[in-house]
């Protein structure tokens, strides 16, 4: 079961990735984690990646694909894997295909931008414990105070509206074209494509995923 998750930041991919990993026992493959692990291990690919990153450059698609290929041969990927945040662009998707990495399911989480902004901008965090609240969907008992310690809650820099809207613009420019790319792949019989309404309750989306994935 090889799965790609698509959807804007804040569309609920992370929550559902957790559900899929726990239910089906497959690992989530993050290219960022892979790069860090390869650099730490000092593998040939890791040394190449380190050289590029130390020079302040972006790691090439070829190198990332090579890392993905290496990663999916490991034992924990025997029953499949989950890719979130990769591929981000059509050249990356093409490179994956050319490398012979087959994808069984592409799952798109669809949520309107304004709702994503509301979801993210309303987050409040208790930095010391990592507890997360939301002014509308999961408010603290006392406004802007942590329920347990009574300490102040803060807004993460990444959760500010201007930052969120900028990330959404980048997503629509760069990653959204993958939607039509993978729809065509599904039409050609190379994968299965499903679009999920991410505005629903978490449990409802999870139930639909369980039906799709079996």
Curated annotation (Swiss-Prot):
AMP binds at residues 31, 36, 57-59, 85-88, 92, 156, 167. Pathway: Purine metabolism; AMP biosynthesis via salvage pathway; AMP from ADP: step 1/1. One of its GO terms (cellular component) is cytoplasm. It catalyses: AMP + ATP = 2 ADP. Its main location: cytoplasm. GO terms for molecular function: adenylate kinase activity; ATP binding. Residues 30-59 are annotated as: NMP. Its EC number is 2.7.4.3. PROSITE patterns: ADENYLATE_KINASE. Belongs to the adenylate kinase family. Catalyzes the reversible transfer of the terminal phosphate group between ATP and AMP. Plays an important role in cellular energy homeostasis and in adenine nucleotide metabolism. Consists of three domains, a large central CORE domain and two small peripheral domains, NMPbind and LID, which undergo movements during catalysis. The LID domain closes over the site of phosphoryl transfer upon ATP binding. Assembling and dissambling the active center during each catalytic cycle provides an effective means to prevent ATP hydrolysis. Monomer. NCBIfam families: adk (TIGR01351), PRK00279.1-1 (NF001379), PRK00279.1-2 (NF001380), PRK00279.1-3 (NF001381), PRK14527.1 (NF011100). This is Adenylate kinase. It comes from Yersinia enterocolitica serotype O:8 / biotype 1B (strain NCTC 13174 / 8081).
């Amino acid at each position: 079961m090889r799965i790609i998750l698509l959807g804007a930041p804040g569309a609920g991919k992370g929550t559902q990735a957790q559900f899929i990993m726990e239910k089906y026992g497959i690992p989530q493959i993050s290219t960022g984690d892979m790069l860090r692990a390869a650099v730490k291990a000092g593998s040939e690919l890791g040394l190449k990646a380190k050289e590029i990153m130390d020079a302040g450059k972006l790691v090439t698609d070829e190198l990332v694909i090579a890392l993905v290929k290496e990663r999916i041969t490991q034992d924990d990927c025997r029953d499949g894997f989950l890719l979130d945040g990769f591929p981000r662009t059509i050249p990356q998707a093409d490179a994956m295909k050319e490398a012979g990495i087959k994808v069984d399911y592409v799952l798109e989480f669809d949520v309107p931008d304004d709702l994503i902004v509301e979801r993210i901008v309303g987050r409040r965090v208790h930095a010391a414990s990592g507890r997360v609240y939301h002014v509308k969907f999961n408010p603290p008992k006392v406004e802007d105070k942590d329920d347990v310690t009574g300490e102040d809650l803060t807004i993460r820099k990444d959760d500010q509206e201007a930052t969120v809207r900028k990330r959404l613009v980048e997503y629509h420019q760069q990653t959204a074209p993958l939607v039509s790319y993978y729809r065509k792949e599904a039409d050609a019989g190379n994968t299965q494509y499903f679009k999920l309404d991410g505005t629903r309750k978490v449990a409802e989306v999870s139930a639909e995923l369980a039906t799709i994935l079996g």
